[in-house]
Amino acid sequence: MFYPEHFDVIVIGGGHAGTEAAMAAARMGRQTLLLTHNIDTLGQMSCNPAIGGIGKGHLVKEIDAMGGLMATAIDHAGIQFRTLNASKGPAVRATRAQADRVLYRQAIRTTLENQPNLMIFQQPVEDLIVENDQVTGAVTRMGLKFRAKAVVLTVGTFLDGKIHIGLENYSGGRAGDPPSVSLSHRLRELPLRVGRLKTGTPPRIDARTIDFSQLAPQLGDNPMPVFSFLGNVDQHPEQMPCHITHTNEQTHEIIRNNLERSPMYAGVIEGIGPRYCPSIEDKVMRFADRNSHQIFLEPEGLTSNEIYPNGISTSLPFDVQMQIVNSMKGMENAKIIRPGYAIEYDFFDPRDLKQTLESKFINGLFFAGQINGTTGYEEAAAQGLLAGLNAARYAFDQEGWFPRRDQAYIGVLVDDLCTLGTKEPYRMFTSRAEYRLMLREDNADLRLTEIGRELGMVDDNRWAQFSEKVELVEKERQRLRDIWVHPKADNLEEINQLLKTPLSKEANGEDLLRRPEMTYEILKKIPRFAPGIDDSRPQAAEQVEIQVKYEGYINRQQEEIEKQLRNESAALPIDIDYKQVSGLSNEVIAKLNDHKPTSIGQASRISGVTPAAISILLVWLKKQGLLRRSAS
């Protein structure tokens, strides 16, 4: 039977991608349906209990800047907050938080259940309704049919998922949850390229059986950072330490002696695992010269005795897992309460997607999260937000939107995926971005909140606070530019004492702040430059200092971006047959026909497509009258 109500957007899956997608569409005023196999696992952290990190924290800030929910949820659920790379420049500083799994899940569910325009329904989805290359709905296991103008697939590791512990395996979406087998088979019938990937998780340990007195604690930062631009430290719950232990030669010998029982090394697992989060057996074999690896013992929550040993993800048999755990310092008597495992699952080649994350072959069908070959909560959430907002726009016949590489790490993420594809689980790093200085955590709101407002995703409260911050920063910078000091003026001794070299020429407040030894906090304590921005507005104060100190570098990078954009925005029709373009080599023709890039910029980043080929393509497009601007 058909459900009586028609929806604008259906989101399938309630993980990190699905929850952001559903929220984005609903915030934009679309009637949205979130279909999940279990309402109790909305926002579930399937692997490590943490949000953020290098590159990942940047994504969370961008999600927040556009009105997403991940940053707010972790501010209410984080039990240890740290700023990584704090001693380095602002471009690579990143926020990370350990999470209480229960509090995080509660924060996500509460937000979803109180969001207007959003209905949640518990039923596994087994089929899509596709008519004339257009998705029109979804069918659940009980045969209930839901109709919608757009559908977002965010099914994580559930597509034909297979869990491995040693040489034993069974079907599963994650431990304790069934896989989506029927939906996987249905998707394989569509004209989409499909592959298999693998990820893994470590055994969970009973904290009461660990001797923490032997281990070094790792404490959070004080003062604590916050994730959301609207957040504050008062939202954080009680804080907890992590602890550090290490593998040793005995650990490594146990692993080497049991490799034939590893499904990876026995050839049972076909999927490729994440390069930057390898299993412990992979680390021991790939880094044979290392006699020790650092393991972080991370608490799973304030009311839980479970410990997540970050660094020993494994699919070895349970008896070997016990030996590995007990071989480490402080863990001699530790008990495992959940075994580690590997999971294989289907993913779909993201090169078959537009950069809006809509399928190139099925109109109105959007993909987000691990189904696109990524790994990580943050990468999934970022895609979910983008897919959700574009599904919402599609439902109202509006043109899609996506950020450029110079606008956001979300833009880097989708461009990498849709242009290059991936053969292994993709994770974000700051090193993937060409314009890191422009894509900082601290300015994510300055880059994206105005866009989010135009798209209908940013509410009045966020917009008011953002506008006030922008005005405060602009006024303070103007104030500093207007205050001048002369080297021969009286009472300069106080200023010169703060400088490595005394003033030799007239300078204003911004000139002084550009000096390496000067900070905004010091500057505003000088009577002439007091009072400055109040201590209750640290984001605005930080923005003044960064904008002033890095202005020259930022301006140079902006010039580079403007040069790049001249060709970036030339859009390419998807249905071009590149054999028609005379002058292109057979290799270039094959790669362009395979990738089907949607812009000249995207085409230029395909391996083997030369600058000469791009020039030929631009000339051909102009002759054919096909040269036009892209949606971004």
UniProtKB/Swiss-Prot annotation:
NAD(+) binds at residues 273-287. FAD binds at residues 13-18, 125, 180, 370. Keywords: Cytoplasm, FAD, Flavoprotein, NAD, tRNA processing. It comes from the Bacteria. SUPFAM superfamilies: FAD/NAD(P)-binding domain. GO terms for molecular function: flavin adenine dinucleotide binding. It holds the Pfam family SAM_GIDA_C. Its cofactor is FAD. GO terms for biological process: tRNA methylation; tRNA wobble uridine modification. Coiled coil: none annotated. GO terms for cellular component: cytosol. The keyword Cytoplasm applies. SMART domains: GIDA_assoc_3. NAD-binding protein involved in the addition of a carboxymethylaminomethyl (cmnm) group at the wobble position (U34) of certain tRNAs, forming tRNA-cmnm(5)s(2)U34. Belongs to the MnmG family. Homodimer. Heterotetramer of two MnmE and two MnmG subunits. This is tRNA uridine 5-carboxymethylaminomethyl modification enzyme MnmG. It comes from Proteus mirabilis (strain HI4320).
